[in-house]
């Protein structure tokens, strides 16, 4: 009996570190899946110059900052539809969704944009922080901040 008890203690001592070292499986929340989908729509909308998409996604009082400039919703809509740069490809990488209750979330990640400006090709890598609010009609972005990462 004592031998059996010692064997159980030894087994417990050997197994406990392995159990504790296991990585916790990250829970995927439905809001996170939806927000990543919307962020990817944003990237695709840049290529298509999809004003209707941005009109739907951007809240009425949306604000955007990029490096040293700030724009309101109407400025962003104009830039998307009629801006001088041509975006040929855009994709998101390493997105994380930080939910604050059921109706507010912040999405962080990288946006990589390829295109042409004044006849010259470019590839820009932006670090972004987007703040989303869930309304009756669905998620809308209320604020976005991007900065152009140094090469």
PLM features: what roles do these ranges have?
Residues 125-150:
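Short beta-strand edge/turn micro-motifs at domain boundaries
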Residues 97-105, 132-138:
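A short, structured loop/turn motif at beta-sheet edges
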Residues 103-113:
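A short hydrophobic beta-strand element
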Residues 29-36, 48-103, 116, 120-124:
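A solvent-exposed, acidic/Ser-Thr-rich amphipathic alpha-helical stretch
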Residues 6-10:
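N-terminal export leaders
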Residues 22-30:
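Cleaved targeting-peptide boundary
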Residues 12-21:
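Hydrophobic h-region of N-terminal signal peptides that target proteins for export
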Residues 90-93, 108-110, 123-128, 142:
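Short, surface-exposed coil-to-beta transition loops
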């Amino acid at each position: 009996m004592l031998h059996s008890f010692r064997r159980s203690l030894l087994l417990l001592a050997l197994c406990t570190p392995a159990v504790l070292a296991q990585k916790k499986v990250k829970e995927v929340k439905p809001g996170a899946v939806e927000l990543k989908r919307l962020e990817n729509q944003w990237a695709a909308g840049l290529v298509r110059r999809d004003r209707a998409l941005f009109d739907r996604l951007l809240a009425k009082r949306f604000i955007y900052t990029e490096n040293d400039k700030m724009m309101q919703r109407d400025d962003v809509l104009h830039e998307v539809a009629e801006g001088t740069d041509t975006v040929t490809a855009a994709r998101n990488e390493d997105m994380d969704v930080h939910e604050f209750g059921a109706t507010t979330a912040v999405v962080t990640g990288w946006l990589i944009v390829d295109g042409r400006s004044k006849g010259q090709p470019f590839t820009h890598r932006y670090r972004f922080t987007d703040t989303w609010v869930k309304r009756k009609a669905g998620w809308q972005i209320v604020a976005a901040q991007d900065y152009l990462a140094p090469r």
